[in-house]
């Protein structure tokens, strides 16, 4: 599908980010200065902000980037800068045929409707999470953008021509926008959607005079993490946060994406990462002090996985559970280690406990359903899918997968029982054309046609 193809291209990008301009019509990139670029003639309202990590920061944990839209919109009158640290900057352009509707959604819908119509679990969305920042720029919410992209390369290894080509291929920039970019001191700088846009690795972050919002996607660490031996996750996180702190940027609020329910999602084992990032933003003293003992135990458990120390890992997670019985990440850790210890019944009990506290962990049932199908155990696959549906009833993909599995298992009556629910799904012909045809075929099959 074209949208998914473009998104995969997005993941190849190295960066883009933040500039200044005094002219609303044709802004010129002026590195790091405060800008007044607005969609309307209304002046921006000054935004109260404090240097990052100088005090607790209002931080919202979200599942997918689209959930940041209502928060960003609440600051739109201030026209702040946006600093986004992510593997991909959610800058895929909104399809031309939907831009009028998307503009109306962003400007007129209430927060609930805005989130719903952009959700990754909506079969008929107006925009996808990977379009969130693109849509926000179209709406004029931000004056400039700084994208902090993950990179293991040295600044001198970055290539402008390659970056420009990738911007165009990924649908992030038009050819004219791409040619506006320059490369200096490890920063790509240009104009996208009429806004100064800069991309930089954490090693060469630019100054920024203007107050900003901060958006961190846990997937930022995906290309940087190579296991606990080479790149232990907590030191990696601390190094990144210290680089942000050194800039002394004025930040008004932050959003942190867990990124387990977006396209190209992070594995559920990483779900703790976004929560811990948010904890440090909310309590900056943690960056100076030793991290909580629970985090040390988790780090040790992750490290010991490299040496198959199942009993020691199990012991660590049991200690963590005793300290915080309501931590779903610990329950999920116990689920994983119980599977490794060949205790499937215990594992399912821990998984159920994790799901009861944090329903997103029900996505693991999909992996178990796939495993059961591969082992030619369709009945168990159906049971796992039913568990997933019970915890995540609004996820249309689970429903369609359940019906497909039932039909594959010749459970016609059980599949027909889901037909009314399946028939209510309206799939987007733009984003999910293959689902439109598949659903029509399944409904005809269930009707006996």
Language model regions located:
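C-terminal motif of bacterial Sec signal peptides marking the signal peptidase cleavage site
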Residues: 14-17
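Catalytic cores of soluble, metal-dependent hydrolases
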Residues: 31-62, 68-78, 129-131, 142, ...
């Amino acid at each position: 599908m074209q949208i998914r193809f473009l998104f995969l291209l997005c993941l190849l990008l190295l960066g883009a980010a933040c500039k200044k301009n005094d002219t609303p019509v044709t802004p010129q990139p002026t590195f790091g200065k405060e800008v007044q670029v607005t969609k309307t003639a209304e002046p921006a309202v000054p935004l109260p902000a404090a240097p990052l990590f100088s005090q607790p920061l209002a931080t919202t944990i979200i599942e997918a980037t689209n959930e940041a839209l209502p928060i960003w919109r609440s600051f739109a009158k201030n026209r702040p800068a946006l600093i986004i640290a992510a593997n991909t900057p959610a800058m895929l352009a909104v399809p031309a045929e939907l831009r009028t509707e998307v503009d109306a959604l962003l400007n007129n819908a209430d927060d609930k409707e805005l989130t719903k119509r952009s959700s990754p679990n909506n079969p008929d969305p107006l925009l996808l999470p990977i379009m969130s920042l693109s849509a926000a720029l179209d709406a004029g919410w931000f004056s400039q953008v700084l994208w902090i992209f993950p990179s293991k390369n040295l600044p001198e290894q970055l290539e402008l021509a390659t970056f420009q080509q990738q911007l165009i291929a990924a649908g992030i920039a038009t050819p004219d926008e791409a040619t506006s970019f320059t490369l200096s001191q490890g920063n790509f700088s240009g104009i996208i959607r009429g806004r100064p846009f800069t991309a930089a690795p954490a090693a060469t972050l630019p100054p920024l005079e203007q107050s900003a919002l901060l958006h961190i996607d846990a997937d930022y660490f995906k290309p940087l993490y190579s296991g606990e031996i080479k790149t232990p996750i907590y030191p990696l996180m601390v190094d990144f946060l210290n680089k942000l702190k050194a800039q002394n940027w004025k930040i008004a609020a932050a959003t942190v994406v867990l990124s387990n329910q977006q396209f190209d999602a992070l594995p559920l084992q990483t779900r703790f990462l976004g929560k811990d990032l948010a904890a440090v933003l909310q309590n900056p003293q943690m960056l100076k002090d030793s991290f909580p003992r629970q985090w040390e135990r988790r780090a040790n458990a992750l490290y010991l996985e490299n040496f198959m120390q199942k009993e020691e890992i199990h012991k660590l997670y049991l200690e963590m559970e005793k300290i915080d019985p309501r931590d779903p990440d610990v329950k999920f850790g116990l689920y994983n280690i119980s599977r490794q210890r060949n205790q499937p019944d215990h594992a399912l009990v821990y998984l159920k406990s994790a799901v009861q506290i944090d329903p997103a962990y029900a996505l693991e049932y999909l992996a178990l359903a796939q495993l059961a199908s591969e082992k030619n155990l369709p009945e168990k696959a159906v049971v796992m899918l039913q568990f997933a549906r019970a915890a995540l009833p609004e996820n249309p993909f689970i429903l369609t997968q359940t019906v497909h599995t039932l039909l594959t298992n010749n459970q016609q009556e059980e599949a027909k029982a889901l037909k009314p629910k399946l028939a209510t799904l309206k799939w987007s012909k733009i984003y999910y054309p293959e689902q439109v045809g598949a659903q029509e075929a399944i409904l005809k099959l269930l009707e006996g046609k």
